């Protein structure tokens, strides 16, 4: 067996005499054959697959190593949804490295027919102690979600993930059409590193939406959700593009009993390109965002820029040396137009150090939102470089999949 590929192994059960030579015996074999999908071990194609998170909240409390300790029998190369599922092996939490060597259609090429069908087939659960890494620029996922739920120690690297399209959005009177399904979900999970990942609406951008009941027929939800007490997460060197409501940290104002003291997330060296809002919006959590680049346009026909940092109930955010390039900014509530990069949703704690807006320094701490300064100690080592246009260009060119 070629150990660089996934395979299906037929386990045959026979009784009595040999099946050879008689049609009846052959029929008996076929009737009792069980097709079992198993994953074949593969060689390690990149040493990057064994790296651990090196900075940010994902380094704390034991760190995030994913499948770095995988035995040779738990290293896989996959390029189809059947191979991917076989490598994941359900809830198996033994360390594993899954190298994605092709574009994986999570639907298996079979269109979803209803909400229930999409729920059953599109949500792919990732077990503990797993690294999923794309090889070169080949690692892609479409038509589904990677769900990291109720587990620990997961790494997603060098992947392109197209945000799923809800085939059956629900309509709410007064709120219009609302979609389910996020590209990546981190739910009730600790220690996750997302690095060099691109998440995009891809083939169905929002300007292609149709209209139903006189309302825009919205079919996208979020790019990344981090919720229900998840903790110790780093998102780095990634690219979020062509999306509206992008990253949500903390899903409800009423979930403080589970979220308070958790939802600690670091964003660094990421590019947010033509996204509308929520980069991120945070409730209860503590977010550190440094050396990120935000590019938007208030007049964009599909992804109208609204804000970058949304400070929600009991949420806090420290911004350091970020670069915002936002076209057609406007004053909001009498404040300088630069203040529109931050929005207060009942949150009280926000500070910025050294960020630039459209190439110039600006004091975001003086916008008059009534925020208290972010005073919590950052426990990990990091280097927030002084942001310049040159550095912003470098961060942008290095962000996303295919750049590892």
Curated annotation (Swiss-Prot):
Cofactor(s) this protein cannot do without: Ca(2+)
Stored InterPro entries: Pec_lyase (IPR002022), Pectin_lyas_fold (IPR012334), Pectin_lyase_fold/virulence (IPR011050), PEL (IPR045032)
UniProt keywords, alphabetically: Calcium, Lyase, Metal-binding, Secreted, Signal
Cofactor note: Binds 1 Ca(2+) ion per subunit.
Biological process terms in GO annotation: pectin catabolic process
Signal peptide positions (record): 1-41
GO cellular component assignments: extracellular region
Principal subcellular localisation of the protein: secreted
Pfam families in the record: Pectate_lyase_4 (PF00544)
Keyword Transmembrane: no
Binding positions for Ca(2+) per the UniProt entry: 182, 225
EC number: 4.2.2.2
Domain of life per record: Bacteria
GO molecular function ontology, one term from the record: pectate lyase activity
Record field: catalytic activity: Eliminative cleavage of (1->4)-alpha-D-galacturonan to give oligosaccharides with 4-deoxy-alpha-D-galact-4-enuronosyl groups at their non-reducing ends
Its job: Involved in maceration and soft-rotting of plant tissue. Pectate lyases have been implicated as pathogenicity factors which induce maceration or rotting of plant tissue. PelE is sufficient to induce these effects under laboratory conditions.
UniProt xrefs under PANTHER family: PECTATE LYASE 18-RELATED, PECTATE LYASE 21-RELATED
Family to which the UniProt record says this protein belongs: Belongs to the polysaccharide lyase 1 family. PLBC subfamily.
The name this protein goes by in its record: Pectate lyase E
Organism: Dickeya dadantii (strain 3937)
Taxon lineage: Bacteria, Pseudomonadati, Pseudomonadota, Gammaproteobacteria, Enterobacterales
């Amino acid at each position: 067996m070629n150990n660089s590929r996934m395979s299906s192994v037929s386990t045959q059960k026979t009784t009595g005499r040999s099946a050879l030579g008689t049609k009846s015996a052959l029929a008996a074999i076929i009737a009792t054959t069980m097709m079992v999908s198993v994953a074949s071990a593969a060689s390690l194609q990149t040493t990057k697959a064994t790296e651990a998170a090196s900075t940010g909240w994902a380094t704390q409390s034991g760190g995030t190593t994913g499948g770095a300790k995988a035995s040779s029998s738990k290293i896989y190369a996959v390029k189809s949804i059947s191979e991917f599922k076989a490598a994941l092996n359900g809830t198996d939490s033994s360390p594993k490295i899954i190298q994605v060597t092709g574009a994986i259609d999570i639907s298996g090429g079979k269109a979803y027919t209803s909400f229930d069908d999409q729920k059953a087939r599109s949500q792919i659960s990732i077990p503990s102690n797993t690294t999923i890494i794309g090889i070169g620029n080949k690692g892609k996922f479409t038509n589904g979600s990677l769900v990291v739920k109720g587990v620990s120690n997961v790494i997603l690297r060098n992947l392109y993930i197209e945000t799923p399209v809800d085939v059956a959005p629900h309509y709410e009177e007064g709120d219009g059409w609302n979609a389910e399904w996020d590209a990546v979900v981190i739910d009730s999970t600790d220690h996750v590193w997302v690095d060099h990942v691109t998440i995009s609406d891809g083939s169905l951008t929002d300007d292609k939406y149709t209209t139903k009941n006189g309302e825009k027929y919205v079919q996208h939800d979020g790019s990344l959700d981090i919720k229900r007490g998840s903790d110790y997460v780093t998102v780095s060197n990634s690219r979020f593009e062509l999306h509206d409501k992008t990253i949500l940290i903390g899903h409800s104002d009423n979930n403080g009993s589970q979220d308070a003291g958790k939802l600690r997330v670091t964003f660094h060296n990421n590019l947010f390109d033509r996204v509308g809002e929520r980069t991120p919006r945070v409730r209860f959590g503590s977010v550190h965002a440094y050396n990120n680049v935000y590019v938007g346009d208030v007049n964009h026909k599909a992804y109208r820029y609204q804000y970058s940092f949304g400070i929600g109930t009991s949420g806090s955010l420290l911004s350091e040396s970020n670069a915002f390039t936002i076209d057609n900014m406007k004053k909001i509530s009498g404040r300088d137009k630069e203040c529109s990069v931050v929005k207060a949703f009942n949150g009280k704690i926000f500070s910025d150090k050294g960020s630039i807006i459209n190439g110039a320094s600006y004091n975001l701490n003086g916008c008059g939102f009534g925020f208290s300064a972010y005073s919590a100690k950052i426990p990990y080592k990091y280097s927030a470089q002084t942001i310049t246009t040159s550095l912003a260009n470098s961060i942008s060119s290095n962000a996303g999949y295919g750049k590892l």
